[in-house]
Amino acid sequence: MSKLAVVAAGGTGGHMFPAQALAEALAARGWRVVLATDDRGALYADKFPAEERLALSAATAKSNDPLGMIKAGFVVLQGVMEARAAFKRLDPAVVVGFGGYPALPALLGALSQGRPTVIHEQNAVLGRVNRFLAPRVNEVACAFPILEKATPAVKACAHVVGNPVRPPVRALFDVPYLAPEVQLRVLVTGGSQGARLLSELIPEAVAKLPEEMRGRLKVFQQARAESMEQARKVYRNAMVECEVAPFFRDMAGYLRQSHLVIGRSGASTCTELAVAGRPSILIPLKIAADDHQRFNARLLEEAGGAAVCLEDELTVDVMAAALKALLSKPERLEKMAAGARSAAKPNAAEELADLVEKTAR
């Protein structure tokens, strides 16, 4: 019988999409895959190639909430016991965690049974759960050449494999960027959770662009449900063609069409922009844990692939000026596209799968 890997991820698309890409790579090599996730992660798992899903108890709490931390500890302990029972039945050859509190019970359960373990950090800053697990697991993989908040020992042994992306996005690495000639296509994405700031600010900024530029624009706007109608109204009044939706499932298709992307700088967003070779304006989420989105954005900015606007400095006028400066210079967009692609690691899923196979028993 083929070997089985448990992939533990959940919480957001930022954890789930790389986990799915690894699962697909392992499945293509003949592995069986079981997904350990939570209710939120299940929302992104409709195409996850898993023969079974484990819903393990998991919880988190703020460090300044002692009672909440105690309660969360008991919930995690319950999840660990659930994981141990499931692993005794499944006997996985390896357990792979993608960070976030939903992955913790599975990894602790595996460690308590002496099973091979691998963790992957998607961001340029080692997350809290992975920070705890890193000294204890067999192998640490990471997406970026910098890994803030990691100890020197962890940094020294970490494998820089990149962030796994799904095959449709990986295919864009081989598609050349075509600078705009007539129509200007802009994709606005707030990440898998949407972004109120972008839902409301970007349409207003677009409305301030010169009439000639607005007449050439087509905007694909991801917006929160409560902001969609207002966004459509602003675009309509500005005579801008638009497509507004709460979530774009075919992200590869929209990336392929777009000349410029505006979005947050979560790990998946930055990785997909690099692999697709798309220029971008990035707005790091100010409240992101350990300011990890700013570190993610910096890597694309230093490669020449992105312009970065900090939330505290962002206004409608600032965004309008940034849009005008980029959309009026196709040659600059082409140069940024090349810069973004220079930061890509398109074979991350295969490299991580190699590491997982090497670690498995």
Curated annotation (Swiss-Prot):
Transmembrane region(s): none
Pathway in which this enzyme or protein is active: Cell wall biogenesis; peptidoglycan biosynthesis
Membrane protein topology class: Peripheral membrane protein
UniProt superkingdom: Bacteria
One GO cellular component, as annotated: plasma membrane
Entries under Pfam families matching the protein: Glyco_tran_28_C, Glyco_transf_28
Annotated positions binding UDP-N-acetyl-alpha-D-glucosamine: 12-14, 123, 166, 192, 293
Record-listed E.C. numbers: 2.4.1.227
GO biological process, one term: peptidoglycan biosynthetic process
Cited CDD domains: GT28_MurG
Protein name listed in UniProt: UDP-N-acetylglucosamine--N-acetylmuramyl-(pentapeptide) pyrophosphoryl-undecaprenol N-acetylglucosamine transferase
Catalysed reactions, as listed in the record: di-trans,octa-cis-undecaprenyl diphospho-N-acetyl-alpha-D-muramoyl-L-alanyl-D-glutamyl-meso-2,6-diaminopimeloyl-D-alanyl-D-alanine + UDP-N-acetyl-alpha-D-glucosamine = di-trans,octa-cis-undecaprenyl diphospho-[N-acetyl-alpha-D-glucosaminyl-(1->4)]-N-acetyl-alpha-D-muramoyl-L-alanyl-D-glutamyl-meso-2,6-diaminopimeloyl-D-alanyl-D-alanine + UDP + H(+)
Function: Cell wall formation. Catalyzes the transfer of a GlcNAc subunit on undecaprenyl-pyrophosphoryl-MurNAc-pentapeptide (lipid intermediate I) to form undecaprenyl-pyrophosphoryl-MurNAc-(pentapeptide)GlcNAc (lipid intermediate II).
Molecular function GO terms recorded: UDP-N-acetyl-D-glucosamine:N-acetylmuramoyl-L-alanyl-D-glutamyl-meso-2,6-diaminopimelyl-D-alanyl-D-alanine-diphosphoundecaprenol 4-beta-N-acetylglucosaminlytransferase activity; undecaprenyldiphospho-muramoylpentapeptide beta-N-acetylglucosaminyltransferase activity
Family matches, as Gene3D superfamilies: Glycogen Phosphorylase B
Subcellular location: Cell inner membrane
Similarity remark: Belongs to the glycosyltransferase 28 family. MurG subfamily.
Entry keywords, A to Z: Cell cycle, Cell division, Cell inner membrane, Cell membrane, Cell shape, Cell wall biogenesis/degradation, Glycosyltransferase, Membrane, Peptidoglycan synthesis, Transferase
EC top class, as a word: transferase
Protein species of origin: Caulobacter vibrioides (strain NA1000 / CB15N)
